[in-house]
Amino acid sequence: MADRLMTVNAYTTLDLVDGEAKGHGFTEEAFATLNVTSPRKNPDHVSLQLELDPTELDTLAPHADSVRLSPEQARKLAADLEKHAKNVEQA
């Protein structure tokens, strides 16, 4: 990804996934980077970050999205991911 905003290295959770952005009147698909982190010093949240490859986008400007999750929210998300992964595997 050229013009990348997120740092990607060996510790990045998923460095190449299929991504999609939807807005009023557009849908764009691009490769994406998805990462989960927490602060090294005094961790008080879990961050989930997503960046679509800006070289594949026509409508959106280069950007990265991030949400801050409490430990409880992160565990709920992880449980939901596990449940849906199991559903897909069993289909």
Summary of predicted features, one role per range:
Residues M1-A91:
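Positively charged, low-complexity terminal tracts
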